[in-house]
Design a protein with these regions (language model features):
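Conserved HGGG/HGGXW glycine-rich cap/lid loop of the alpha/beta-hydrolase fold
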Residues: 13-61
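Active-site loop/oxyanion-hole signature of alpha/beta-hydrolase fold enzymes
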Residues: 50, 54-93, 132-135
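Conserved serine/cysteine hydrolase catalytic core
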Residues: 186-257
Length: 296
């Protein structure tokens, strides 16, 4: 990354406060943005990082179908960021839930974005998207109780996960070697213990983003991409997909590239690769931002 310097990004709008261009970041389901601090470190050498601390836990932006309100939360946060820093546009970076909501924000309000790098968005595409759409419709029938989406999405597992521990130390011991967390770097996992949990009145700790919100996010994953849009966003965007991600195995990025001409590249790791390889992923993001600037 020695070839990348501040001059590499000089054509981007510059914050009147920090004299750097601005990245707006949005996090994965259940992973508050401060957990990503190891990922932010390299980016912060060149950019000011702004983010929504917690998606899915704000009454003004409830978790609803197709993540419409969460998408609006991204748009509103980006508008506020532009106003704060005196810029017309930001660079958007998102992971998972945050990547998908950011993508939808690109379609909704493209004028606020210069470009985007989206990491492993749950962009369910093609015929599978139609299946999810029908499943969500059927789940609204009496007595269905979200039965179909709990099978199709991670909601069925998430709703049964443990969400209370005696202490942060207890949570660390119980979670560190679990499949979902086992490949996190130590700093990323320590960040989750610090920011992904909060203390209850009785001294125990629970999820900072409630389990009910986490489950609701999975059940309402956007499912209209069998129908629309049939064009790429108006601003440059590239996807980064984990080599072991279920989305790559289901060939969603491949379909998106073929249909919408949105490019993707891969990085070692699974769906949570930005927390498994924060330094190399941040370098990849910087390289993509520079590449997309050069292509304009």
């Amino acid at each position: 990354m020695s070839e990348v310097n501040l001059q590499s990004f000089a054509s981007l709008p510059i914050s009147k406060i920090t004299q750097k261009p601005v990245i707006h970041f949005a996090h994965a389901n259940g992973m508050p943005s401060p957990v990503y601090e190891p990922f932010f470190e390299k980016l912060a050498e060149f950019f000011t990082i702004e983010y929504i601390s917690m998606l899915g836990d704000t009454p003004d932006y409830p978790v609803d179908n197709q993540w419409r309100s969460l998408t609006q939360q991204i748009v509103d946060s980006v508008k506020d960021t532009c106003k704060k820093h005196g810029v017309k546009q930001v660079v958007a970076v998102g992971h998972s839930l945050g990547a998908m909501c950011t993508l939808q924000a690109l379609y909704r309000a493209p004028e606020y974005f210069s470009q985007a790098v989206l990491m492993d968005p749950p962009w369910i595409y093609g015929k599978v998207s139609l299946l999810w759409h029908l499943a969500k419709t059927a789940d609204r029938l009496p007595l269905m109780n979200n039965r179909l989406m709990d099978k199709l999405s991670p909601a069925g597992v998430s709703k049964h996960r443990r969400d209370v521990w005696d202490s942060r130390e207890d949570a660390y011991d119980k979670l560190r070697n679990k499949g979902f967390f086992k490949d996190f770097t130590e700093r990323s996992f320590q960040g989750y213990i610090e920011h992904g949990l909060h203390e209850r009145a009785d001294g125990k700790v629970t999820l900072a983003i409630p389990k009910a919100s986490e489950v609701a996010v999975f059940r309402t994953n956007p499912s209209w991409y069998w129908l629309t849009p049939n064009r790429a966003p108006k601003v440059p965007v590239t996807l980064i997909i984990g080599e072991d991600s279920i989305f790559l195995k289901r060939r969603f990025p491949q379909q998106i590239k073929s249909r919408l001409r949105i490019p993707y590249i891969t990085h070692a790791g699974g769906h949570m690769f930005p927390l498994e390889h924060p330094e190399s992923v941040s370098e990849q993001v910087l390289a993509l931002i520079e590449k997309q600037l050069s292509a304009k």
